[in-house]
Design a protein with these regions (language model features):
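Subset-of-secretome marker
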Residues: 24-158
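Bacterial N-terminal signal peptides that target proteins for export
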Residues: 1-9
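Classic N-terminal secretory signal peptides
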Residues: 11-14
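C-terminal motif of bacterial Sec signal peptides marking the signal peptidase cleavage site
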Residues: 18-20
Length: 158
């Protein structure tokens, strides 16, 4: 019994040290418009100022302006079709009676910023990515990315 207790204490201590030393952080930014809300969630390394993942969640409230429901759904579906097959990008879309939603997750380590074929296939998506993920000194800088999106009226969620 004492051996199990000692082993458990050692494992908890090791876990505490590993988690305590991690410099990974998460930040959220929101852009609220009349009928839409865009949330950007960055996962980044504080010490290295490098982004590892970006999640974009776009929600269109169709109860606020039903005239544009089909146009929004069509535009979302076009963007999804463009994104299919781009390495490092996953997405989910959801429709219900009140909302049209698109969630895009970008794995910065796998995503190819300079892939000309993908860039030509999905110009709207790449323009959004280049706004939200700013490269500096061969990394995607969290601070530079944050400053860029704040210029587009995103607000940091504290």
């Amino acid at each position: 019994m004492k051996k199990i207790l000692k082993l458990t204490m050692v494992l908890f201590g090791a876990l505490f040290v590993l988690l305590g030393c991690s410099s990974e952080a998460k930040s959220e930014f929101v852009l609220q418009k009349t009928a839409s809300k865009t949330k950007l969630t960055y996962v980044y390394d504080k010490e290295k100022d490098s982004v590892s993942k970006l999640t974009m969640n776009i929600v269109y409230d169709i109860t606020k302006d039903e005239r544009y429901t089909e146009a929004v759904r069509s535009q979302r579906n076009e963007i999804v079709a463009e994104m299919e097959g781009i390495e490092g990008v996953t997405f989910t879309k959801k429709d219900d009676n009140n909302y049209i939603t698109l969630t895009v997750e970008i794995d910065v380590q796998k995503f190819k910023f300079d892939d000309l074929v993908s860039r030509q296939k999905a110009p709207t998506f790449y323009n959004s990515v280049n706004t939200a993920l700013v490269r500096k000194n061969n990394i995607v800088s969290y601070e530079e990315s944050k400053n860029a999106i704040l210029q587009y009226e995103f607000k940091e969620v504290k």
